[in-house]
Amino acid sequence: MKIQLIAVGTKMPKWVEEGFQEYRRRFPHDMPLELVEITAGKRGKNADIARILQKEGEAMLAAVPKGNRIVTLDIPGKRWDTEELAVQLESWKLDGRDVSILIGGPEGLAPACKAAADQSWSLSPLTLPHPLVRVVMAESLYRAWSITTNHPYHRE
């Protein structure tokens, strides 16, 4: 199973790139973690936010390979603790489809992305900076994988 993070935003700070890559490289070859960056729409004083969200959403959905499970990151989504995420990871593997996780931009996700989702996941009731979410996602997914394989990374 391949896990694909599809995130709005490019040109992240060096610490984000390094943090994401640190965890991405730890994933096993049979469960690679891939990042697809979607260019954010230009936001300005008179920006049409609804139109920007629509365009970002179209680009995100176009990046999802046909047949993938779509999981959106959204504050009202389901919250999983680490062990519950490990159970979800196992469930996704048994489903037999690759997984695309959608991370929206500053205004969140387009309605079309939410409508296309098989699941919605909430990392936290807090609003997190989008660059940080990439690193947190990579680490959380790696930790969940480590639980499913009895790897010593996760300690209770």
From Swiss-Prot:
S-adenosyl-L-methionine binds at L73, G104, L123, S124, P125, L126, T127, L128. It holds the Pfam family SPOUT_MTase. It is an enzyme of class 2 (transferase). Disulfide bonds: none annotated. It catalyses: pseudouridine(1915) in 23S rRNA + S-adenosyl-L-methionine = N(3)-methylpseudouridine(1915) in 23S rRNA + S-adenosyl-L-homocysteine + H(+). It is found in: Cytoplasm. One of its GO terms (molecular function) is rRNA (pseudouridine-N3-)-methyltransferase activity. InterPro entries: Alpha/beta_knot_MTases, RlmH-like, tRNA_m1G_MTases_N. Keywords: Cytoplasm, Methyltransferase, rRNA processing, S-adenosyl-L-methionine, Transferase. Its main location: cytoplasm. Its EC number is 2.1.1.177. One of its GO terms (cellular component) is cytoplasm. Specifically methylates the pseudouridine at position 1915 (m3Psi1915) in 23S rRNA. Belongs to the RNA methyltransferase RlmH family. Homodimer. This is Ribosomal RNA large subunit methyltransferase H.
